[in-house]
Amino acid sequence: MDIGRSLNKAIDIGQIEGAFAQGQGWSTSEEFLYFPSTGRLFTTGPGNYKIPSALDIPRDFRVELLEGADTSALKTIFSSKGVGEPPLFLGASVFFALRDAVLAKRRQEGVSAPLHMESPATPEILRMACEDQLVQMARIPQTLKDGKTPFVIRI
């Protein structure tokens, strides 16, 4: 990721680490659930889903800023660039690592069907994607008995 010339390394590293944590939350917990009766959004904020805490993010990030690049072509203040939002997508690496773990479990269980797994990779979605015997016994149909619908649905 190109951030131009760093004006303050500590701030830039903090921005990268913070954006990673935000991206991790985005790709693992910020799930959109809707009320089936009204179509209104149920998960309207962090009161309805878990945001990453200090125990959920890596203790050791190992962020390095490379120096010595020619930034003379940049026509910005002190040849710098914004660093706050670009690293947000680094959090997707967590999603893909979890997806690889699920694929390994599915191979172990003898499941050869293709895996369709969308973000966010919530614990529930990860567990259901494993397709083992316990998951098969716990499946809840989209339409319940007597034509009733679940409280919230995933679209």
Predicted regions and their residues:
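Cofactor-binding beta-sheet edge motifs in enzyme active sites
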Residues: 1-155
